[in-house]
A protein has these predicted regions:
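Short secondary-structure junctions
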Residues: 87, 144-146
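Internal, well-ordered alpha-helical segments in soluble enzyme and binding-protein domains
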Residues: 129-137, 169-172, 176
Length: 242
């Protein structure tokens, strides 16, 4: 079942999901030791684009939280949940974590299915095995996840269609993990997956903080690099013609 926590009453003119208070949502989420996590945003840059929703749940129940309408008290409840000792399962969590860091939310324990998939197929040609959630759902579960709605979020924001789509992204990850875990054990990669997933938090924080860059010096470097490239191309062309 899909639950939506939102103070935007226009989103509840449907029977595709049910309205839930934060208390009701927590009654669904608190028993979970493994919880799937995803977000929807208005763009890719965590510092200039808004966090729209946080999705939490499992294959039986999904809770979509409309972050844009929450009260400070409700946001604190979500923060406390995400910073608990639960293991949060996601896909390409570096992206989601940067948006959570902007909100002052720092999950402790995460597992990233995309990282596990990359490790399992490390060294294979990229085209042999796609690493997206859509591809994993098909490869492991024979389930087709429709991603067409994702392109509408930037312009449309949170709509009934987006709520349903968002819930779908926290439905299948646990089942995929169970399948991946079998292969991870076969290849003796359990520690490697744990280490790489732990590093995702640091990488996300690095991305969130950014890097100080001297623009003037960097442009000067670019000019030198371009000059070297032009010279190399000129010399190569002269050699070929000769």
């Amino acid at each position: 079942m899909i639950y939506l926590v939102s103070h935007n009453k226009s989103l509840f003119q449907t029977d595709k999901y049910v309205e839930a208070t934060m208390k009701q949502a927590m009654s669904v989420l608190l028993p979970l030791k493994l919880c799937q996590l995803d977000t929807e945003t208005k763009g890719l840059d965590c510092h200039t684009k808004a966090l729209l929703t946080i999705q939490l749940g499992n294959k039986d129940n999904q809770v979509v939280i409309d972050w844009t309408t929450l009260t400070p008290k409700e946001k604190q409840i979500v923060k406390n949940y995400l910073e608990s000792d639960r293991l949060f399962l996601g896909w390409n969590l570096m992206f989601d974590l940067t948006f959570l860091y902007v909100q002052g939310i720092y999950p402790k324990h995460i597992w990233d299915g995309m990282i596990a998939e990359q490790l399992l197929y490390l060294g294979y040609p990229a085209q042999m095995r796609e690493k997206s959630l859509k591809a994993a759902a098909w490869n492991y579960l024979n389930i087709n996840i429709d991603k067409t709605v994702r392109g509408k979020i930037v312009n449309d924001g949170l709509t009934t269609e987006v709520v349903i789509y968002a819930a779908g992204d926290v439905t299948y990850i646990e089942d995929i993990k169970e399948k991946q875990d079998i292969e991870v054990e076969k290849q003796g990669m359990k520690l490697a997956v744990e280490l790489e997933c732990e590093f995702v938090k640091s990488l996300a924080y690095f991305k969130y903080c950014g890097v100080h860059l001297d623009v003037t010096k960097w442009k000067a470097k670019m000019a030198k690099d371009q000059a070297k490239l032009n010279k190399a191309i000129s010399e190569l062309n002269a050699w070929v013609v000769a």
